[in-house]
């Protein structure tokens, strides 16, 4: 049984038949298109360009987060390239979506992937939706399409799934250049309906 550990360093570790495998996401330099994935087995580095080796192409510009959805699928947000890349555990591309621009962090319930976004638009199965603030997109892992969205606060970052709800940290990170204040709220979303339950002010 594969086990997943997600660390603050945006790495995932899998224990498969006593072999430790670590996949480490490297953001690279902003606007330099040099993001990459490093791959380790049993504490030894196998490749510092794991995605490129497997797919003969670059990963993209400023990858931001990585999560294992199930035993067959891993998702990566690539912020400045405006791509969510889906790969298999051997590093090969499965699918990608460009429907969630300025994507940030990831959460999953094993059936869907939930992505926070600083953006103000999103491509969904029902057409394009526009937002005043940031939002969370719900992606079907079988079709890789956005099936629902929920507007939250400005510039949402961290997102977690727990017992049917999503908890989203709003930052207001663009307050220095846009006409709004910094945020101190956490938005709670019903993951099934993608309806906002309430905002909690953390002070």
Regions found by a protein language model. Name each.
Residues 1-4, 18:
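Positively charged n-region of N-terminal signal peptides that target proteins for export
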Residues 4-13:
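Sec-dependent N-terminal signal peptides
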Residues 18-203:
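Predominantly soluble domains enriched in secretory-pathway, periplasmic, or organellar proteins
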